[in-house]
UniProtKB/Swiss-Prot annotation:
The gene is atpD. Belongs to the ATPase alpha/beta chains family. The lineage of its organism: Bacteria, Bacillati, Actinomycetota, Actinomycetes, Mycobacteriales. This is ATP synthase subunit beta. It is an enzyme of class 7 (translocase). It comes from Corynebacterium glutamicum (strain ATCC 13032 / DSM 20300 / JCM 1318 / BCRC 11384 / CCUG 27702 / LMG 3730 / NBRC 12168 / NCIMB 10025 / NRRL B-2784 / 534). InterPro entries: AAA+_ATPase (IPR003593), ATP-synt_VA_C (IPR055190), ATP_synth_F1_bsu (IPR005722), ATPase_a/bsu_AS (IPR020003), ATPase_alpha/beta_chains (IPR050053), ATPase_F1/V1/A1_a/bsu_N (IPR004100), ATPase_F1/V1/A1_a/bsu_N_sf (IPR036121), ATPase_F1/V1/A1_a/bsu_nucl-bd (IPR000194).
Length: 483
């Protein structure tokens, strides 16, 4: 907690240094002997550019020796000159925490972008963004499913409450839309608190997200933190920690279950690579930083459940050139409890969410956790889809007529299952003209069990397109057949 007295003491203890070198976002600063600031401390320096004064925050990254430190600037360094006075704040970068952050947009430094009255307010509690993960004895050992109401997720890749979920996919397959949908569903169904960290987010996307959430009435339960694409790499590297710190307060102090959305974790890795290069470190595989695994671990280990409360994290992961062996997505895989792969070939069929049911995984899809019936139905669905995939080469060469009657039935059911795994989203209503749908898990299991049993073999494939539950299927069937 930061109080007014602590602020005053910190100002009195502030140490002055001077800038000795500026190379882009890297600033070297000299301090008096014995008064070097600690690693990760925030420093401030006044910059005048075109008669406009601004304060630039620097974060200590390295001690170089000879009373020199190397820092990363959290803002453009235009106008910064050698000899400029630098002040050590004696604390790391901090962000506001508590109910005051809900419904507002912040940058990585904790400055509110939509209500400046919240800035520099001594009555608002602030936490430093560099924190230790919970100790082992604080961790929650119980495993619980997080029901989303999205059929393909709940049935085939169930999410863990308090777990880490990765949304993998190339550009334009629907990662951000799925994240927006999850924010909406959590706010509507659970009245839960969400924190959105936009790492290297496009300004247009951030604006759209803010306006859509405001329109749908879920903004008041969400805090948004953005490190935009045009900002220095230091900002993009720290914004995920800023959002996580806000989420930790809701978990640890208010005892809430929180959802943390990070879009996009690849840009967190990318920013770390840029910072590593600026600091002069030797690059590792494919040009990434040698500290990639360590930096990812520092972030991911803080995202966890403690006794009675949780942070559930949904992380969009851009896959460069759809290459899953790239070190960035490969390093992320190791920390995840569930992976949802969004597939371009499924999106091209007009099926959304474009989740690939054969490559998406969840560690809790086992009978002891989800139950025997759920597990059995999910395996039957996967089996039918896998068999259909194996038959595609035969169909492409010889045609459907060369298949056995049993295989023809399997292919027909697989097509219905594929289409029924699609679902209209609440956030897509204005684009599709169709209302969004929330399908309870029990209804999802019932529906797919009946499809696998052949109860709907006489229904045309079109009756299953982008719908909610079986009631929607039956209504579509009546509309198509006129019965």
């Amino acid at each position: 907690m930061t109080t007014a007295l602590e602020e005053q003491n910190a100002q009195q203890a502030a140490t002055a240094g001077r800038v000795v070198r500026v190379i882009g976002a890297v600033v070297d600063v000299e301090f008096p002997r014995g008064e070097l600031p600690a690693l990760y401390n925030a420093l401030t320096v006044e910059v005048t550019l075109e008669s406009v004064k601004k304060t630039v925050v620097l974060e200590v990254a390295q001690h170089l020796g000879d009373n020199l430190i190397r820092t990363i600037a959290m803002a453009p360094t235009d106008g910064l000159v050698r000899g400029a006075a630098v002040t050590d704040t004696a604390r790391p970068i901090s962000v506001p925490v508590g109910d005051v952050v809900k419904g507002h947009v912040f940058n990585a430094l904790g400055d509110c972008l939509d209500d400046v009255s919240l800035n520099n307010n001594p009555e608002i509690e602030r936490w430093g963004i560099h924190r230790e993960p919970p100790s082992f004895d604080q961790l929650e050992g119980k495993t619980e499913i997080l029901e989303t109401g999205i059929k393909v997720i709940d049935l085939l890749t169930p999410y863990v409450k308090g777990g880490k979920i990765g949304l993998f996919g190339g550009a334009g397959v629907g990662k951000t839309v799925l994240i927006q949908e999850m924010i909406t569903r959590i706010a509507r169904e659970f009245s839960g608190t969400s924190v959105f960290a936009g790492v290297g987010e496009r300004t247009r996307e951030g604006t759209d997200l803010f306006l859509e959430m405001e329109e749908m009435g879920v903004l008041q339960d969400t805090a948004l933190v953005f490190g935009q694409m045009d900002e220095p790499p230091g900002v993009r590297m720290r914004v995920a920690l800023s959002g996580l710190t806000m989420a930790e307060y809701f978990r640890d102090v208010q005892n809430q279950d929180v959802l943390l959305f990070i879009d996009n974790i690849f840009r967190f890795t990318q920013a770390g690579s840029e910072v590593s290069t600026l600091l002069g470190r030797m690059p590792s595989a494919v040009g990434y930083q040698p500290t990639l695994a360590d930096e990812m671990g520092v972030l991911q280990e803080r995202i966890t459940s403690t006794k009675g409360r949780s942070i559930t994290s949904l992380q969009a992961v851009y896959v460069p050139a759809d290459d899953y062996t790239d070190p960035a997505p490969a390093t992320t895989f190791a920390h995840l409890d569930a992976t949802t792969e969004l597939d371009r070939s499924i999106a091209s069929k007009g099926i959304y969410p474009a989740v690939n049911p054969l490559t998406s995984t969840s560690r809790i899809l086992e009978p002891a956790i989800v139950g025997e019936r759920h597990y059995e139905v999910s395996q039957r669905v996967i089996g039918i889809l896998q068999k259909n995939k194996e038959l595609q080469d035969i169909i492409a060469i010889l045609g459907m007529d060369e298949l056995s009657e049993e295989d023809k039935i399997t292919v027909a059911r697989a097509r219905r299952i594929e289409r029924f795994l699609g679902q209209n989203f609440f956030v897509a209503e204005k684009f599709t003209g169709l209302p969004g749908s929330y399908v309870p898990l029990t209804d999802t299991v019932d529906a797919f069990e009946r499809i696998c049993n052949g109860d709907f073999d006489h229904y045309p494939d079109q009756a299953f397109n982008g719908l909610g539950g079986l009631d929607d299927v039956e209504a579509a069937y009546k509309k198509l057949t006129g019965k």
